[in-house]
């Protein structure tokens, strides 16, 4: 069966009674009906104070202190801290994966001005992702194995969420001297 569609516009007649059904806009209402909480005393002594000491924040030094991942501003993770981070991603149900980079572990462009594959954003995967891993010491043992195979490489641990198919966590597990 075929159906027939029409492009003709349908015009309805409007009566004066219909026009009066909606009240005209009379402007915004006064704000006096709403409660207002204003602080009448603007004395500077009532503001938060640090006891008279003024400490300015320092700027991250851009030379010889490269930032790599989320926790790169912190000192190198101890073995205990590393195990806690690995345990966190395992508790979340993420799949641990190790990657390493021999050479500069930051984004650089020496062959071209535009971004590409060989500009330091992509690291080499160490073995396969550790699907089914439930123990943080297994991941730490793989970090040691990668560190022994490539002592001059940076090693990072990534946590993948295989349900959402995204990388959820990434941190440096080993930095060469």
UniProtKB/Swiss-Prot annotation:
Q: Does the keyword Cell wall biogenesis/degradation apply?
A: no
- On the tree of life, the source organism's domain of life is Eukaryota
Q: Which SMART domains match?
A: RuBisCO_small (SM00961)
GO function term, MF aspect, one: ribulose-bisphosphate carboxylase activity
* CDD domains for the chain: RuBisCO_small (cd03527)
For this UniProt record, give its keywords in alphabetical order, as a comma-separated list: Calvin cycle, Carbon dioxide fixation, Chloroplast, Photorespiration, Photosynthesis, Plastid, Transit peptide
| Transit peptide start and end | 1-55
Q: Looking at the UniProt record for this protein, which Gene Ontology cellular component terms does it annotate, in alphabetical order? A: chloroplast
Task: Enumerate the subcellular locations listed in this protein's record, separating them with semicolons.
Answer: Plastid, Chloroplast
GO BP field = photorespiration; reductive pentose-phosphate cycle
State the protein's purpose.
RuBisCO catalyzes two reactions: the carboxylation of D-ribulose 1,5-bisphosphate, the primary event in carbon dioxide fixation, as well as the oxidative fragmentation of the pentose substrate. Both reactions occur simultaneously and in competition at the same active site. Although the small subunit is not catalytic it is essential for maximal activity.
* Miscellaneous comment as given in the Swiss-Prot or TrEMBL entry: The basic functional RuBisCO is composed of a large chain homodimer in a 'head-to-tail' conformation. In form I RuBisCO this homodimer is arranged in a barrel-like tetramer with the small subunits forming a tetrameric 'cap' on each end of the 'barrel'.
User: Subunit arrangement?
Assistant: Heterohexadecamer of 8 large and 8 small subunits.
**Record's family?**
Belongs to the RuBisCO small chain family.
Protein name from the UniProt record: Ribulose bisphosphate carboxylase small subunit, chloroplastic
